[in-house]
Amino acid sequence: MRGRTRIGKFTTCGERNPKKVARTQPTKKDLKTQNPILHSDQGWLYQMVGYQAILRENSIQQNMSRKGNYLDNNAMENFFGRLKTECYYDKRFETFKQLKKQLMSIFIITTMITFRGN
């Protein structure tokens, strides 16, 4: 990826239903950019034809790193690695709402640090 990488929208979904997860993804209009890219791992959900079709309908390009190769999209892999380390590993959540609150708190902190650094 060339140019600046930024997170245009951050969403969460408490289910592993491909259609519901795909519907939580931002649209091109939401992102206010010409060429939005969604970065994900190679999980089964992201490889499903229905999920990929919904992304195409919304003009969102899907980007997946090759298995075991974090260098394909170092910026996003680094972000997700940090996110998991700081708010997921070694923690227990009773509800999805608690996990979502933790994710949003780290997202806000990361965004503030990024803007201060620019």
Curated annotation (Swiss-Prot):
GO molecular-function terms, A-Z: DNA binding
The keyword Protease belongs to this UniProt entry's keyword annotation: no
Coiled-coil residue windows: none
GO BP annotation list: DNA integration; DNA recombination; transposition
Alphabetic keyword roster: DNA recombination, DNA-binding, Transposable element, Transposition
Transcription regulation in keyword set: no
Pfam families with a match to the protein in the record: rve_2
Family assignment from sequence similarity: Belongs to the transposase IS3/IS150/IS904 family.
Identification of the protein by name: Uncharacterized transposase-like protein HI_0493
Organism of derivation: Haemophilus influenzae (strain ATCC 51907 / DSM 11121 / KW20 / Rd)
